[in-house]
Amino acid sequence: MTPETDFDDVVICLFDGEYHLGVAALTNSLVKYQFKGLINVGYRGGVLPLWVKQLQPLSDNYFRISDDVTIHFKQVLSNMHLGYFKPFFIKETFDDYPAAKKFYYFDADIIVQAPWMLYFNWVENGVCLCLDSAFHFIHHNHPWRKDWRALVKGRDHLLNPTFQYFNSGFLGIDRNNIILIDRWIDITNQFIKKNGQINYFIKDSHSSVRGDQDLLNAVITTSSDIEINVMGKEAMGFSLPATLMLHAIGERKPWNSSFIVHLLKYGNKPSTTDKAFLSICKYPINIFSVFRYSYKKIDLLSTCVLGRFLG
């Protein structure tokens, strides 16, 4: 096998800063659930994560995770928010690995919770998408959708009367549907031309475009010719039981949380995602030092016990 070419399945991820800890957790979960292939990671900054030293180097920023999994790091030079950069990096990955057939983008705060064969089969039937947690239902005549249509020219005949709104943290796609990525790039460029802000996410809850997720949904809204294969909120663990993955949405992440502080200050008990994250921190990548792992484990267990007493 040559690292550059011989992969059928490619997982794609982007990170900067401490999100490298999420990439390590995602990697561990992929190995646990029998993924075989390449993990192509785009990173911002000049230094690879320290945990890379645990891996066997191959060549040109390729490292062996296991007999079946290789990870590659590619530096991102763009200044745009990594969310908006998603379709561009996905397209780069398509181009860099022409022999690969199936591609799966994951945000760096997601971990896999189901056998990989389910993902593999899922992509067989169209572009794979998951409903969002908060805005999973948006009417096909919602003002946001009308704003999205205004960003797209020449596809009025392809309007999709969907009521669904999708989370952009995961996307499964095969090479035959690359047109979706091309359209996502095109609509991002149209947004930029209209002076859209792509260096950070807009906090205004009334805006029709606050981040890359809205632009992905704009593409779906104007692409009735692309078959999509949708799972509900349970797919990302937004409703339980979670079926495929767990998505740690929000600013608080399992790797940067003091569970006991969040319980006492905000009344938030450790989530299913928090517990699952800590359970995959040790293999094949040791995400934390022995001391920090022990501290976080004690923090989690003591918070769970205290949470039962507090109700």
Residues of each region from the PLM?
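Conserved hydrophobic/aromatic beta-strand scaffold that supports enzyme active sites
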Residues: 89, 170-172, 245
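Conserved catalytic core of nucleotide-sugar-dependent glycosyltransferases
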Residues: 118-187
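A glycosyltransferase accessory/donor-loop signature
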Residues: 1-7, 158-161, 178-311
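A short, glycine-/small-residue-rich helix N-cap motif at loop->alpha-helix starts
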Residues: 78-86
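Short, polar loop motifs at secondary-structure junctions
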Residues: 43-49, 112-116, 233-235
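Residues that flank catalytic or metal-binding motifs in active/ligand-binding sites
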Residues: 86, 106, 166-167, 212, ...
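GT-A fold catalytic core of metal-dependent nucleotide-sugar glycosyltransferases
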Residues: 87-139
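N-terminal anchoring/stem segment of glycosyltransferases
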Residues: 1-78, 95-99, 283-311
